[in-house]
Curated annotation (Swiss-Prot):
Residues 25-352, 364-693 form the Transferrin-like domain. Monomer. Found in a complex with LTF, CLU, EPPIN and SEMG1. Interacts with prey activated coagulation factor X; the interaction inhibits coagulation factor X catalytic activity. Found in a complex with MPO and LTF; interacts directly with CP, allows Fe(3+) incorporation into LTF and activation of CP ferroxidase activity. Its EC number is 3.4.21.-. Hydrogencarbonate 2 binds at residues 478, 482, 484-485. Belongs to the transferrin family. It comes from the Eukaryota. This is Lactotransferrin. InterPro entries: Transferrin, Transferrin-like_dom, Transferrin_Fe_BS. GO terms for cellular component: early endosome; extracellular space; plasma membrane; recycling endosome.
Amino acid sequence: MKLLFLALLSLLALGPSLAARRRGVRWCTISKPEAAKCSKLQQNLKRVRGPSLSCISRKSYLECIQAIAAKRADAMSLDAGLVYEAGQDPYRLRPVAAEVYGTEGAPRTHYYAVALVKKDSNLQLNQLQGVRSCHTGLNRSAGWKIPVGTLRPYLGWAGPPAPLQEAVANFFSASCVPCADGNQYPNLCRLCAGTGADKCACSSKEPYFGYSGAFKCLKDGAGDVAFVKDSTVFENLPNKAERDQYELLCPDNTRKPVDEFEQCHLARVPSHAVVARSVGGKEDSIWRLLSKAQEKFGKGTSGSFQLFSSPPGQKDLLFKDGAQGFLRIPSRVDAELYLGPSYLTVIKNLKESAAEVEARGARVVWCAVGPEELRKCQQWSGQSNGTVTCTTAADTEDCIALVLKGEADAMSLDGGVIYIAGKCGLAPVLAESQRSEGGSNLDCVNRPLEGDRAVAVVRKSSAGLTWNSRRGTKSCHTAVGRTAGWNIPMGLLFNQTRSCNFDEFFSQSCAPGADPNSNLCALCVGNEQGQDKCAPNSNERYFSYAGSFRCLVENAGDVAFVKASTVLENPDGRGTEAWAKDLKLEDFELLCLDGTRKPVSEFETCHLARAPSHGVVSRKDRVQYLEQVLLDQQGKFGRNGPLCPGKFCLFQSETKNLLFNDNTECLAKLQGKTTYEKYLGPEYVTAVANLRQCSTSPLLEACTFLRN
């Protein structure tokens, strides 16, 4: 009994510390100096009554990544190259806070990977074969992935399964690549200065490890070129006269002074980031800890402990010494979004054979929203003999994210979503030009873009309903964020009321993409089984133009916000679906902004606004190729193509408006409207920006962070 009592006392004594560790953040360190700094941070946080911190020791970044994934640690800061590795299976970590560089007046969450040489050398970037090289570490961004990716054409590397490290070892006469396997590839560790087991070590035990170590390798004369970041030489040589003894190698085989890194660099790289688990990652706790740490011990503080400083002889412990602070990364950002398409392309190029790289560049990956679009896309892919392949996502924003990450190339979007895509850095490729009477296919491709009219349509029998009396009625919308169904009518409503409480203006609505538990989803019906209610894809039967009009036709709503062409395409036998078969155009009318009503045929004088055409978007580096492929594809499968309707039609759908609008005559050239601002027009861009005061999208928030 006495032993049991003592055991209980022991557990009670341990309990608070165990609970504190669960609540607190466990930071992973990779060396004794890092562990010592972590311990000091822990003590100083305790002194200022900050968040709880404990320190976990491992031997390498990989072991720390594994510990975080296994819930034996919670966080650490990683170079972008390691952020990529940590974001892959089986770890699936994500960046939660970015280190901020630059100055207080001009902060930035990126840096530039550069190739640094001594001024008295005669080297150019295309003359590095056979020289001695200094690297920050294996698989790190500025020191390995970027330079090796840049030099790939000269390496004589056929791609996997041939080892990349072997190709690099044979390319340079000697190197120091900390973390490399010196037994298997001795040339990669030949220049390293560590002794015994510390030679080529993956930590500061190797004097030439990290940015400052790679620079020291060059400065000491061990190497001829150092692959580092733009600030490395400034941090190690405060004296300008000393810095002037070094120059940068530029991709165009010229050289520039070290302060011209924005014009002479190998790549722009996202800054180091603190990573955590994607699920159950303690993101809020980590951010509270970082916020308190930078407030109490960051730049400009006077205490003896400095968060962004390392003891003499050490560099970049826990965080970069040159960091100014942290910025929280929006929750929508995963490792691939954080790194961006250019950096991801470099990484993919290092994982694929030359043939695979070429094949990937020749393919067009279309992003289909939902299962119905995917089925049509797969039909297209089969008929295109693999020129077009398909991927899918649940909604348009997820598709945009796939395009940003290089996992997809293109999709066609409503103008409101083109706004988000443009803010994220994508560009228009071709526009959906509406079907018109007469005119050849060539005329259509080169025809000036007109767009469509956004209208408010009601049943003729609801005689008392006007634009001025729509408060309290039931409304049908194409989807939240879409042009005719949301941005235009709700933008007008916001201008009228200056209120964002849209769910209080109408009694009930169906606005796919809204909160499923709100009034804005009350009229939505989901699929035939009642699932996916209010989903922003074709699983919701009241989604998009035809769905919004169907919501009105089936008496769910009193007013539907659609395009004029939507109303014209469905009545009088034009609509093929069961709900549209007995409709008559004369049974519907339009609400005019002046409070009157007019027949649908008079939409030119009774509409809410002109809506920009749907358009195909892609990454800027793919626009020219996408235009070429899509014009070729519509030459075969377009409205006048020889294989439509026999084989496949781009602009026909089993249901409605899959991949493209069914009333598209052709994909037309942009007539100079090559940016999202020019494509949408200044008035529409301003209207959407104003409406964004009421709500933002997680993707738009993420892109705003990533592009600053």
